[in-house]
A protein has these predicted regions:
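Domain-level signature for proteins that mediate thiol-based redox and metal-cofactor handling
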Residues: 1-54, 59-245
């Protein structure tokens, strides 16, 4: 039985939930970047998205747009995905590249320093670190000893709902750094064993704090730019207390 338009729209939104801001590792849907979504009976999906400022980096914008196209195109009934960026200094150029199936390098020519693969890899590693830190701190807070934590059998470990969610999110990124045959639950970004957990955690914390700072700033800028209620203002961001150690 074919799906109706509302069901297809729901599937598209679920696909967009898998697309993250590369720096923040948060879904573009949660960040309220998606401004418009339409599904036509012929299987054409049109997505309009926005960013917090007119000057957001072109490579970030292109990366997110390409990821939206890729994820939505995996739905079996989709025939075409049109992604359009609005109110951005490079919107015309980015939209032209997306509409014509061009790479970032082909779209920007000499203005592009490199293709997106290297940038994507950089932010995948940061996402790995943030998710790893969240799970490690959860386990330590619940009594697991740092000395043996790397050898925990994660998949068999009984966890509550919060822990299960943290485990799932971490395992989604674990293979970025660890080989499938790697017996240790936790390795560093080079795939090496973690020799001393405490200084390693401090390194991870710096990555997380930076991402939290950028996330709060992003939401504040988005709310200020589009004059929306319900989002933190820049003043509230400035007053945000430091994260507990």
């Amino acid at each position: 039985m074919s799906l109706g338009i509302p069901e297809r729209e729901a599937e598209v939104r679920l696909a967009l939930d898998r697309v993250t801001d590369p720096e923040l590792d948060e879904p573009v849907t949660d960040l309220r970047f998606i401004e418009r979504l339409t599904v036509d009976p012929d299987g054409t999906v049109s997505i309009g998205f926005r960013l917090p400022t007119y000057w957001c980096a072109a490579n970030f914008a292109f990366l997110m747009a390409a990821d939206m196209q890729r994820e939505v195109a995996t739905l079996p009934w989709v025939r075409q995905v049109k992604v359009t960026l609005g109110e951005h200094m490079y919107a015309e150029k980015i939209n032209h590249g997306l509409a014509n199936g061009l790479s970032f390098q082909a779209t920007f020519g000499n203005e592009a320093s490199a293709e997106l693969d290297e940038l994507r890899r950089t932010f995948l590693l940061k996402a790995f670190q943030r998710r790893q830190e969240a799970l490690l701190r959860y386990l330590i807070e619940r009594g697991h000893q740092p000395a043996g934590i790397a050898l925990i059998e994660l998949k068999a470990l009984p966890l509550d709902a919060q822990g299960a969610r943290l485990r799932t999110r971490y395992l989604e990124k674990r293979d970025i750094c660890a080989k499938p045959s790697e017996p240790r639950a936790f390795v560093d970004t080079c795939g090496n064993p973690i020799e001393d957990l405490n200084p390693y955690l401090r390194t991870l914390e710096r990555v997380s704090i930076n991402a939290e700072f950028n996330g709060a700033l992003c939401r504040g800028l988005l709310a200020a730019r589009f004059n929306e209620d319900g989002e933190p203002t820049l003043l509230e961001f400035a007053r945000k207390p430091p994260r507990a150690a």
